[in-house]
Amino acid sequence: MLPLKFHEGGLIPVIVQDQKTREVLMMAYANEEAVRLTESTGSAHYYSRSRKKIWKKGEESGHFQKVGRILVDCDEDCLIYEVEQTGAACHTGYRTCFYRTLDGVTIGEKIFDPEKVYGKTGH
């Protein structure tokens, strides 16, 4: 593995992209352990800054990300996970976390009701 440059708190930003459509699905953070777990298992793992723990995408929702390839940027301080997305990527129920324009117009497709999956609304 290349020598990654982790930012403050030992985290690196991860952009998640659909490996077929190239659609950007989400952005999250990973620590070194989460990156290694992702690399070794082929399932996307991230680090939750609010819960202060590693989490596997889909462990609660069933909407998993199978990682086909991990790309590293030129400065070695940002990653792209190219994934096969099962269901929605966003905890709000949308396929992608980027489902709104800057002026607030919803352009994305809602896949599930977060209240039914998590017992709470997405926001």
From Swiss-Prot:
GO molecular function annotation: magnesium ion binding; phosphoribosyl-AMP cyclohydrolase activity; zinc ion binding
UniProtKB keywords: Amino-acid biosynthesis, Cytoplasm, Histidine biosynthesis, Hydrolase, Magnesium, Metal-binding, Zinc
Cofactor detail note: Binds 1 Mg(2+) ion per subunit. Binds 1 zinc ion per subunit.
Pathway info: Amino-acid biosynthesis; L-histidine biosynthesis; L-histidine from 5-phospho-alpha-D-ribose 1-diphosphate: step 3/9
Keyword Metal-binding: yes
UniProt-listed InterPro entries: PRA-CH, PRib_AMP_CycHydrolase_dom, PRib_AMP_CycHydrolase_sf
GO cellular component, one term: cytoplasm
Subcellular location as annotated: Cytoplasm
A GO biological process held by the record: L-histidine biosynthetic process
Cofactor: Mg(2+); Zn(2+)
One of the Pfam families matching this protein, by short name: PRA-CH
Binding sites annotated in the UniProt record for Zn(2+): 74, 90, 97
EC number(s) recorded for this UniProt protein: 3.5.4.19
Catalytic reactions on record: 1-(5-phospho-beta-D-ribosyl)-5'-AMP + H2O = 1-(5-phospho-beta-D-ribosyl)-5-[(5-phospho-beta-D-ribosylamino)methylideneamino]imidazole-4-carboxamide
Positions annotated to bind Mg(2+): 73, 75, 77
Principal location class: cytoplasm
Assembly, per entry: Homodimer.
Family assignment from sequence similarity: Belongs to the PRA-CH family.
Purpose: Catalyzes the hydrolysis of the adenine ring of phosphoribosyl-AMP.
Protein name as it appears in the record: Phosphoribosyl-AMP cyclohydrolase
Species the sequence originates in: Methanoregula boonei (strain DSM 21154 / JCM 14090 / 6A8)
Lineage, opening ranks: Archaea, Methanobacteriati, Methanobacteriota, Stenosarchaea group, Methanomicrobia
